[in-house]
């Protein structure tokens, strides 16, 4: 049987070989394929933390936990040493202030100055806001995550068990419109929780590996809260692309052989979806190839 990571390596290779060369929003340019699907079996505890390069899984899980708080400001992320969202507010600050501040100096100001963080660390109504506090036309806020878990507990055969972040009325206010847009869930007759994640836009080298980990961690948490066990994680990509400054790195990664996937487990039964912490996650048997450095396109 082929290693499950081979699906991802094959997608990298296909994008390198057949990707449509496009000029994109960032100005970097991409090789793009439209429509991709990967399927990962989480039932034995294995999770899609890539082994052909080191993936900083704790960073991905911390980001997912931040989403679940409903957060929209980078300050709590920086307090957890997570810097993956800094580029967008930094670019906005440089553009609006004219100050050529370094990323390190900008992040330090966010950490030390609450007023500065409130003004310049804000990302707008991004993922967490939509997941936990979607604003309806009547002014009421809707908690999609709480509603999902309640439905999983009370009506697990429902075909309406999903949440998403593409709020048309607020997309223009977001620092970055949602890439991993829709999460849908399905319960089998033997109590397995399957998940499907749809991404409209996929940075295949840098973004997708984090999205795999975040979605798997979320599936473990939701399964525990609903009294289920994890099943399949199905990942679907829309515009699936490699940035032109990532091609050498992608070629390097496709030349590496996958190693055994690690296992992820929760160390305790949390009282609710809001009670999980990074310390609740254990990853065992992770032995990856070295990290592959690449620049984020903003």
Swiss-Prot record:
- Cytoplasm as a keyword? yes
Q: In which pathway does it act?
A: Pyrimidine metabolism; dTTP biosynthesis
Protein's name in the database:
Thymidylate synthase
Annotated function: Catalyzes the reductive methylation of 2'-deoxyuridine-5'-monophosphate (dUMP) to 2'-deoxythymidine-5'-monophosphate (dTMP) while utilizing 5,10-methylenetetrahydrofolate (mTHF) as the methyl donor and reductant in the reaction, yielding dihydrofolate (DHF) as a by-product. This enzymatic reaction provides an intracellular de novo source of dTMP, an essential precursor for DNA biosynthesis.
Its EC number is: 2.1.1.45
Could you tell me which species this protein originates from? Cereibacter sphaeroides (strain ATCC 17029 / ATH 2.4.9)
| Catalytic residues, chain numbering | 179
| Cellular compartments per GO CC | cytosol
Q: Which family does it belong to?
A: Belongs to the thymidylate synthase family. Bacterial-type ThyA subfamily.
- Residues reported in the UniProt entry to bind (6R)-5,10-methylene-5,6,7,8-tetrahydrofolate: 203, 297
Gene designation:
thyA
Task: Indicate whether Cell division appears among the record's keywords.
Answer: no
